[in-house]
UniProtKB/Swiss-Prot annotation:
Keywords: ATP-binding, Carbohydrate metabolism, Isomerase, Kinase, Multifunctional enzyme, Nucleotide-binding, Transferase. HAMAP family: ManNAc6P_epimer. This is Bifunctional enzyme NanE/NanK. It catalyses: an N-acyl-D-glucosamine 6-phosphate = an N-acyl-D-mannosamine 6-phosphate; an N-acyl-D-mannosamine + ATP = an N-acyl-D-mannosamine 6-phosphate + ADP + H(+). Pfam families: NanE, ROK. Residues 1-234 are annotated as: ManNAc-6-P epimerase. In the N-terminal section; belongs to the NanE family. It comes from Brucella melitensis biotype 1 (strain ATCC 23456 / CCUG 17765 / NCTC 10094 / 16M). InterPro entries: Aldolase_TIM, ATPase_NBD, NanE, RibuloseP-bd_barrel, ROK. CDD domains: NanE. One of its GO terms (molecular function) is ATP binding. Residues 235-518 are annotated as: ManNAc kinase. Disulfide bonds: none annotated. One of its GO terms (cellular component) is cytosol.
């Protein structure tokens, strides 16, 4: 007994925190022979694996002879009167022990079976081997340990029910079983290094990986499906960009806008007539899309749309825009803040092209979006990137940045200086050499420069992309860069002009719906 216990401790210590490779070829494949299994075993050992899982007594015997790694042995059978396949008979246990398996795996699920799992575990122990129980539930793990199993494997999770096999491994089962105190091996659908690492972090002592290493038929299929799916033209996305004055509807595929329509944004935001008017813009496109997406000004938190600045657009409180538009369109609808959507568009197809970035749109107001590590950062409250809402010191106290540096802010400062008109007229006056106009624009650029320097310090993106009617107006980026000259070099961001223009939001929101949220 002491000798057996010592062997158990020695082997589990060799496996703790290590990779076990399952060398089980696809049945009747070109690799379904003893020589291939031995080659797999040798390659696994040479590459740093610490254990092998092998099916069939002949394969176990050959691998145990060719490798110094401990072998988990099993025999698979297809029975007419039982769904249990892994080592269902006592004679299977005997054959595996005689073949040299250090560990014998048995199906320990709670299903109809020819021999109780407890008897199989007892026979493994009687023969001086380590008993591994392949289970699918926490209750089965507890029963197997009560029967004397030395190792629990999550092998059967997802393979005992009536429904389709899950795509991902059962990390929840790993976490629950890790609290039982026995040696735990995570197994089943670990098809990436990331998933294997997650299993260890979830509490597994070791991880078995099979198909992703030793089944080229499966690996080829994964890559084939990914390539063919990417090459296949996707269905267009129905996308809307709803602004305070106009609404754009378009069918979008990738960065290509296939068709577009524009209308004046209806009054009575959120009313049934408002929903109906916007939905009617795309009525004859029914059947050409499967998903829809909406870019809107304001705050989007989950499915709830609300105002960040009611002066820009008055939105009914806690308005479920996605649900209302989804019902009208008969399709699932994603709703994204328009500046965040534009940030994604510029990241995917525009000025940033895959770089960590912040996008700022400077027009009637100031909005923004952040993309880091390939992810759109929406934030806990849906307001990430909303630089225009940051409070800054104004002439008479703290005000929103967009009050001073947006199109509305520029027009207001011009009016206070005795010059009525909009931001466009201020730019025209500055271009004509009017000193008052240039001072207003330089002041706006200075306020914005201080804010983006702070943004660089907080987010530290590779670039800050500037768009919007004010941001792209002649000379404004030069003024912004000039104002940034008063800040230290490390705080001066790489300022680049947006490339997608007014289409950034609708392209971005469509791509998010097609790829990011699908």
């Amino acid at each position: 007994m002491c000798r057996v216990q010592g062997m158990i401790e020695e082997i589990v210590n060799r496996l703790r925190g290590k990779l076990i490779v399952s060398c089980q070829p696809v049945p009747e494949s070109p690799f379904d022979n003893v020589a291939s299994v031995v080659a797999y075993a040798r390659a696994a050992e040479a590459s740093g694996a610490s254990g092998l899982r092998i099916e069939g007594a002949a394969n176990v015997a050959a691998a145990a002879q060719a490798s110094t790694l401990p072998v988990i042995g099993l025999i698979k059978r297809d029975l007419d009167d039982s769904p249990v396949r892994i080592t269902p008979f006592l004679e299977d246990v005997a054959a595996l022990c005689d073949a040299g398996a250090a560990i014998v795996a048995v199906d320990a699920t709670d299903r109809r079976r020819p021999v109780p799992a407890a008897e199989l575990i007892g026979e493994i122990k009687r023969r001086g081997r380590i008993a591994m129980a392949d289970i699918s539930t926490l209750a089965e793990a507890r029963n197997a340990l009560a029967a004397g199993a030395d190792i629990i494997g999550t092998t059967m999770s997802g393979y005992t029910g009536e429904g389709p096999t899950p795509k991902d491994p059962d990390l929840d089962l790993v976490a629950h079983c890790s609290r039982l105190g026995s040696f735990l091996i995570a197994e089943g659908r670990y098809n990436s290094p990331q998933q294997a690492g997650e299993a260890i972090r979830a509490g597994a002592d070791a991880v078995v990986v099979g198909s992703a290493i030793t089944r080229p038929e499966h690996i080829t299929g994964w890559f084939r499906d990914a390539v063919e799916s990417a090459a296949k033209p996707s269905s267009p996305v129905l996308a809307f960009d709803i602004g305070g004055t106009k609404t754009l509807a378009a069918l979008v595929r990738g960065r290509e806008i296939l068709e577009r329509r524009v209308m004046t944004t209806p009054a009575s935001v959120g009313s049934e007539s408002w929903i109906g008017a916007i939905a009617s813009l795309s009525a004859d496109w029914q059947g050409r899309y499967q998903r829809a997406a909406i870019a809107v000004t304001g705050r989007v938190d989950g499915e709830i749309w609300s105002s960040l600045n009611p002066e820009t657009l008055a939105i009914p409180p806690d308005y479920p825009l996605g649900r209302r538009m989804g019902a009208a369109l008969g399709a699932p609808v994603e709703v994204i803040n328009d500046a965040q959507a534009a940030a994604w568009g510029e990241y995917r197809f525009g000025a940033a092209r895959g770089r960590d970035m912040v996008f700022l749109t400077i027009s009637s107001g100031i909005g923004g979006g952040i993309v880091l590590g390939g992810r759109l950062i929406r934030g806990a409250r849906g307001i990430a990137g909303s630089l225009g809402q940051v409070l800054v010191a104004g002439p008479s106290g703290f005000v929103r940045l967009e009050t001073l540096a947006s199109g509305f802010g520029i027009a207001k400062m011009a009016l206070e200086a005795g010059h009525a008109g909009d931001a466009r007229s201020v730019f025209s006056a500055a271009a004509a050499g009017e000193g008052w106009a240039r001072r207003i624009l330089l002041d706006a650029a200075s306020q914005l420069a201080a804010a983006v320097a702070g943004l660089q310090a907080i987010v530290d993106p590779e670039c800050i992309v500037i768009g919007g009617g004010v941001g792209m107006a002649d000379g404004f980026l030069d003024m912004l860069r000039e104002a940034l000259g008063s800040h230290s070099a490390v705080m001066r961001p790489d300022i680049v002009a947006a490339e997608l223009g007014a289409d950034a939001g609708i392209i971005g929101v469509a791509d998010l719906a097609a790829t990011y949220f699908s």
